[in-house]
Amino acid sequence: MGIKKMFKKKDPTEGEIRDELTQIGVTTKSDNKTRQEKFGAFKNYAQDRQNAKPGFQPVNPYANVNAGNGNGNPYAQQEAGGDGDGEAMGGNNSSPYDKTTNPYGSRSERANNPYGNGNVGASSRGERAGGRNTQTNPYGGARASGRASGSKPNPYGGVQNDGALADDTESINTAVTGYADPYGNETARASRQSTRRPRAYDEESLDLNAIPSHQAYTPSKPIKRTQMRDDETLDLNDLPEEEDLNLDVDELPEQEQVDSEDDEVEAIKQDIRFIKQESVGSTRNTLRMAQEADASATNTLGMMGSQSERLYNAESNLLLADTQSKIADQKVKDLKRYNRSIFVPAYGNPFNKKSRLRQQEMQIKADKAQEKYLRDTNRKEMYASEQRIKQGISQNATSSDVHQKYRSERDLEAAQRYQFENDSEDDEMEKELANNLDQIGLYSKKLQSSAKTMGNEVDSQNKRLGQIEEDADRLDINVHMNSARLNNIR
């Protein structure tokens, strides 16, 4: 056995196979000639973002507020078994916000209202471990229980409240207000309606979607001003003179007309300034969002460039695998011929040896030319994709300083048509407004160009993916056929 192993032919190594293929002119994969990635930073950024641990990502602390792990609302209504904070020795540490009831609830909920009518027996804060000292509500009605043992009498309980014997309207109004009149029947008879506004009124009067109006938008009318002379005395009982709303501006005195016109001019100036400031703020926000969109588009283009590089690597590997598959096919045919019977000669016809050699050379040339053509085609597609993405990324959304100076002067001249008593601040706002609008327009053009570049790149990569799919299917079939031929060799 040892001698047999000694003379057994060893399997060739990968380096020996590669050297042999290189000698016969077959292209092999070289680890030293790796193509430098120009969009590798985008690929690394995407991989780091995908492989980021959940602990490093921002966590919302309010995500599980309603979970059943005890992190619920501490002020929610709970059905505690104690009497609130009135028990000093009972050991019940219930929340002071428990058993909260709606004071505006229905009539069935009036028993839970601590400030309801006098029929409610509230637990006292003076309750101890020995017994219950019930203390009534000092602001309750005349029918509040003041005769319990140890209880303090109501100082207003002597007056009998006959309002409880009135109709249901008074009792409902008393329940809505949340407390009875402590001064007895006289006040109850005087006012039978609640002074509290219903909830529907508050909901109708409060509009959360209403836009707050600015004082500059409030139209100012000419106001008739009365100036007090030095010899006049101040009479506190004197009624102010009524304003005549039908009075025309032309009928006012000259000084008052001048004052009203000055007020109107000042209000118009304030309106212009306020609207201009709002416009500048809007353009700033729009420019910021345009810059964010441009950064997102640049990142997307970079990711597509990295994807194009990986597609090129896949195409090169498939081309190399196809070449190796053809060589394997030829080797399988030779092995099948050598494995024939000893009675059938393995060598061919000696009379057509030259023609066979010439045919093999032509086949090698054709395979090499086809391989070179496919490699050049893949390289051209990769170069075109790289140039498209570089052009989309390197587009500049800003202009030169000379162009900016020329544009600012032209914008100031154009703004003179609708400016009114402008100062340096107005000129600066006009410059910023015009500059922001120009930048927004340039960013819009760049985004449009980036979108077109993305569309063209996506179409090109889709075609390349289709070609890769076809090559992979053909390679799979060839490998499967070679495996079947090897299995059939006996």
Curated annotation (Swiss-Prot):
It comes from Debaryomyces hansenii (strain ATCC 36239 / CBS 767 / BCRC 21394 / JCM 1990 / NBRC 0083 / IGC 2968) (Yeast). The gene is SEC9. InterPro entries: T_SNARE_dom. It comes from the Eukaryota. This is Protein transport protein SEC9. Residues 58-80, 140-151 have a biased composition (Low complexity). GO terms for molecular function: SNAP receptor activity; syntaxin binding. Belongs to the SNAP-25 family. Residues 1-244, 389-410 are annotated as: Disordered. Residues 232-244 have a biased composition (Acidic residues). SUPFAM superfamilies: SNARE fusion complex. Gene3D superfamilies: 1.20.5.110. Residues 94-105, 392-401 have a biased composition (Polar residues). GO terms for biological process: exocytosis; protein transport; vesicle fusion. Keywords: Coiled coil, Protein transport, Repeat, Transport. The lineage of its organism: Eukaryota, Fungi, Dikarya, Ascomycota, Saccharomycotina. Residues 9-21, 30-40 have a biased composition (Basic and acidic residues). Residues 273-335, 427-489 form the t-SNARE coiled-coil homology domain. CDD domains: SNARE_SEC9C (cd15857), SNARE_SEC9N (cd15886).
